[in-house]
């Protein structure tokens, strides 16, 4: 009988799940690839114990990605929630998005995003991606942009391009400033 290290079985399972996700995140950061064997070794569990929580490495990677995207959403929300001016909110969103990249946290999202996920999990990740961009859509609508979805995708493209530049080693401050200037110029043209 396995030892339960929490007040209830549900809490024990949640703690184990968190430990497995944390181990998978660490393995992914170190090697870019997650295997059940590597996660089992990292946690000190048997591979069969890992499979009690996750059917496959893809399911585990999906939880890593979902947790990291949720953290990114929280980071962005904290950056924009108290800003009333939609233009300044857009600037804060771009700045916060790229600070997340510059401090290295986005590398985990990129690595996990390259994995082949089960369709249900892929849909969950796509929903979270839409949540990431929700503040942009809201700000654009408040600015009177009638085709906010299209313009938001352009803003996302600018941020994605700056992300690749930062990850390639270009100075983050320069990329943030350029991305903000370019995005705002585009928004101004769309008004």
Where are these regions (language model features)?
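Basic, helix-initiating cap at the start of DNA-binding domains
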Residues: 1-30, 36-42, 59
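Short secondary-structure transition hinges
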Residues: 59, 98-134, 164, 168
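Hydrophobic alpha-helical segments that form the core
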Residues: 95-99, 146-168, 172-186
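Amphipathic alpha-helical packing segments from all-alpha helical-bundle domains
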Residues: 70-73, 118-153
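Hydrophobic alpha-helical connector segments
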Residues: 63, 77-103, 155
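Generic hydrophobic, amphipathic alpha-helix propensity
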Residues: 15-24, 39, 64-68, 72, ...
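Short hydrophobic/aromatic patch on the recognition helix
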Residues: 43-54
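Amphipathic, non-transmembrane alpha-helical scaffold segments
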Residues: 13, 17, 61-65, 69, ...
């Amino acid at each position: 009988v396995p030892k339960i290290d929490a007040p209830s079985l549900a809490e024990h399972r949640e703690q184990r799940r968190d430990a497995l996700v944390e181990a998978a995140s660490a393995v992914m950061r170190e090697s870019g690839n997650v295997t059940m064997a590597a996660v089992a070794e990292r946690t000190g569990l048997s591979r069969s114990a890992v499979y009690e929580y996750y059917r496959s490495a893809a399911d585990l990677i999906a939880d890593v990605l979902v947790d990291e995207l949720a953290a990114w959403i929280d980071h962005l929300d904290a950056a924009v929630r108290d800003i009333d001016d939609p233009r300044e909110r857009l600037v804060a969103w771009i700045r916060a998005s790229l600070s997340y990249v510059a401090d290295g946290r986005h590398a985990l999202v990129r690595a996990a995003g390259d994995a082949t996920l089960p369709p249900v999990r892929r849909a969950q990740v796509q929903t979270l991606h839409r949540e990431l961009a929700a503040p942009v859509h809201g700000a654009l609508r408040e600015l009177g942009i009638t085709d906010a979805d299209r313009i938001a995708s352009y803003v996302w493209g600018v941020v994605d391009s700056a992300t690749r530049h930062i990850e390639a080693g270009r100075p983050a401050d320069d990329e943030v400033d350029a991305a903000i200037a370019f995005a705002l110029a585009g928004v101004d043209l769309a008004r």
